[in-house]
Amino acid sequence: MLQNIRIVLVETSHTGNMGSVARAMKTMGLTNLWLVNPLVKPDSQAIALAAGASDVIGNAHIVDTLDEALAGCSLVVGTSARSRTLPWPMLDPRECGLKSVAEAANTPVALVFGRERVGLTNEELQKCHYHVAIAANPEYSSLNLAMAVQVIAYEVRMAWLATQENGEQVEHEETPYPLVDDLERFYGHLEQTLLATGFIRENHPGQVMNKLRRLFTRARPESQELNILRGILASIEQQNKGNKAE
């Protein structure tokens, strides 16, 4: 189950942080590390700071885009320390651990951490189902990347241990939720349809698509429900083409 939980680092700029993150992960039983467009490649410093977790570094998936790292996941949680102009469903670290373990029984889960200095962009955060914030000391809330990973990884492990200690058998059944890939295709289809009907203007969608993303993220439609929505969009497109042909 824990292998289904991906720790995703976006544009990490210091190899030492990669090593420290690998160490934080392995102490909690996590080994699935993804590096998105790292500004530097793992090197001897990363191996040194991994302190026995060099296998996590050696087996890390290095990809060019966040979409590649999220492919195949049904749940994505992004870390965010800043308040956003567009509110998003929030979790605390404990809730994040519980939800991640519950969903990782069936499909991959991604826990996404941003750049050392500026974190994740708004666009990247909008690809997440939830945001998680660590309730650090407001007078000094500066956690480095490995510290943040350690906090979240600890809560994941505690949630996983609870299922083991209670003797709970996790049912491995097909998740009813769509994968991130399916959701992104839906958002693309939705934007295309809204453009075709004139509801939004090309190059000037305003906040409409952002707010619609938030709406569907909050509602979190199941796979069958998403298929219904895609069918509605296809019907609107067909009707719109018919009107133009007349």
From Swiss-Prot:
Give the record's keywords alphabetically.
Cytoplasm, Methyltransferase, S-adenosyl-L-methionine, Transferase, tRNA processing
The reported effect of residue 211 to A is: Strong decrease in tRNA binding affinity. Strong decrease in activity
Q: Which CDD domains match?
A: SpoU-like_TrmJ
Question: Molecular function terms in GO for this entry?
Answer: protein homodimerization activity; RNA binding; tRNA (cytidine(32)/uridine(32)-2'-O)-methyltransferase activity
- Effect ascribed to mutating residue 140 to F: Strong decrease in activity
UniProt-annotated location(s): Cytoplasm
Q: What is the effect of changing residue 82 to A?
A: Loss of tRNA binding affinity. Loss of activity
Stated consequence of mutating residue 172 to A: No change in activity
Residues that coordinate or bind S-adenosyl-L-methionine:
79-81, 114, 134, 141-143
Signal sequence segment: none
Family matches, as Pfam families? SpoU_methylase (PF00588)
GO biological process terms, alphabetically, are: tRNA nucleoside ribose methylation
The record, for SUPFAM superfamilies, names: alpha/beta knot
Q: What does this protein do?
A: Catalyzes the formation of 2'O-methylated cytidine (Cm32) or 2'O-methylated uridine (Um32) at position 32 in tRNA. Can also methylate adenosine or guanosine, even though these nucleosides are rare or absent at position 32 in the anticodon loop of tRNA.
Assembly and binders: Homodimer.
What does the comment on domains in this protein's record state? Both the catalytic N-terminal domain and the extensional C-terminal domain play key roles in tRNA binding and methylation.
For this entry, the protein name equals tRNA (cytidine/uridine-2'-O-)-methyltransferase TrmJ
Organism (species): Escherichia coli (strain K12)
Task: Give the classification, highest ranks.
Answer: Bacteria, Pseudomonadati, Pseudomonadota, Gammaproteobacteria, Enterobacterales
Q: Gene encoding this chain?
A: trmJ
